[in-house]
């Protein structure tokens, strides 16, 4: 009664917003948030068509709509959504080996831009999986090109991305960078970190960084894909012993577990509904 109408409304809007181009359906106009690129005539732009982030979000939206329809036994718009989903632009790899940010392989004006929008499908989305070796390598190149500096929330997002890429040590490095103490109150695109009161500094304060920091820690301890739960997927060396309780997993599962010397010694999963999950460790 609440969630489905929101999803359906978004689906209806984007079915009408997408336009055909070269055999695909793309968003137009489209941006990769706040980033700019250089066109073939050396002019600088931010608006184009078919950005990777747009396509990633729509793949997720349409996929979620189809799953919701199956659960609710609804057939409305299913054929249209399935057809549109098949025509959405696939991920593309650019000439530098990076996951492309736009439909065309434009060079970004700022290679170290704080946004990593083209990697939405890796995180927080769940479109690029551990079996997708070529795409994972392209994501790694794109993330490496961005660098490890940035605003407070940016470092949290990068930590989440490195965790998804299987690099716990790099993720931990980003978290430590984010814990850099700053007292800067004016708006700045560099020198991000954490204020003495533990609030994230863009600067100024942005709650994204605090939530993102916690999300990155959880990504390093537990990851999910379909009906699989991966325990300690990218545990950094400094965290060889630990305990976590009350972790909420997809499907309404509550997880508690303890590990020592990188080995799980206790584990409990609770759910209010019956379900089958594959536990990997």
PLM region descriptions:
Residues 6-21, 85-96, 138-148, 175-186:
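Long, well-ordered core segments of solenoidal/helical folds
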Residues 78-119:
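Long, low-complexity segments enriched in small/aliphatic residues
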Residues 1, 5, 15-80, 265:
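The feature captures the catalytic groove of carbohydrate-active enzymes
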Residues 169-281:
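Non-catalytic C-terminal accessory modules of carbohydrate-active enzymes
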Residues 1, 13, 17, 57-72, ...:
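Well-ordered alpha-helical scaffold segments within catalytic/enzyme domains
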């Amino acid at each position: 009664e609440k969630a489905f109408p929101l999803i359906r409304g978004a689906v209806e809007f984007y079915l009408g917003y997408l336009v055909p181009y070269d055999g695909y359906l793309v968003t137009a106009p489209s941006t990769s948030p706040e980033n700019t690129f250089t066109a073939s005539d050396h002019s600088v732009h931010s608006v184009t068509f078919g950005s990777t982030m747009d396509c990633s979000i729509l793949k997720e939206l349409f996929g979620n709509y189809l799953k919701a329809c199956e659960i609710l036994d609804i057939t409305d718009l299913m054929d249209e959504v399935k057809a549109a989903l098949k025509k959405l632009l696939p991920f593309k790899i650019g000439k530098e080996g990076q996951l492309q940010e736009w439909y065309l392989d434009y060079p970004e004006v700022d290679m170290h831009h704080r946004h990593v929008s083209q990697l939405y499908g890796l995180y927080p989305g769940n479109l690029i999986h551990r079996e997708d070796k070529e795409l994972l390598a392209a994501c790694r190149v794109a993330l490496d090109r961005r660098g490890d500096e940035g605003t407070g929330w940016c470092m949290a997002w990068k930590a989440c991305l490195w965790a998804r890429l299987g690099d716990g040590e790099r993720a931990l490095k980003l978290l430590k960078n984010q814990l850099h103490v700053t007292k800067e109150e004016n708006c700045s695109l560099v020198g991000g970190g954490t204020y003495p009161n533990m609030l994230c500094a863009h600067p100024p304060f942005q709650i994204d960084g605090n939530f993102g920091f916690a999300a990155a820690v959880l990504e390093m301890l537990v990851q999910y894909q379909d009906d699989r739960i991966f325990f300690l997927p990218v545990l950094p060396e400094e965290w060889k012993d630990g305990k976590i309780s009350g972790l909420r997993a997809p499907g309404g599962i509550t997880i508690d577990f303890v590990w020592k010397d990188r080995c799980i010694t206790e584990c409990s999963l609770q759910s209010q509904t019956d379900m089958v999950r594959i536990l990997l460790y």
